[in-house]
Amino acid sequence: MKIYDYNGKKNICGDRIHEARCKHRLTQSDLAAKLQIAGITIERDSVSRIEIGTRFVADYELRELSKILNVSVGWLLGIE
């Protein structure tokens, strides 16, 4: 499978995830723990890689991130 980049990044939501996480005063470890409670297997370093754009984000991860961060998926994708 070929891996594609968009403007040098593997996702378009990392900046928004970082913004929302900081607004809620969560650490990357806190966010990873909340995702794990929701059934998503993810570690702190993966959250970091998502935020800097070096890791893809699956649709089910995006859905849970939007719930945890109390924002819409559209906002995370930059279309709202």
Where are these regions (language model features)?
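Short alpha-helical DNA-recognition segment
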Residues: 25-49
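Short helix-capping/hinge SLiMs at alpha-helix to coil transitions
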Residues: 8, 37-38, 53
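DNA major-groove recognition helix of helix-turn-helix/homeodomain DNA-binding modules
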Residues: 54, 58-75
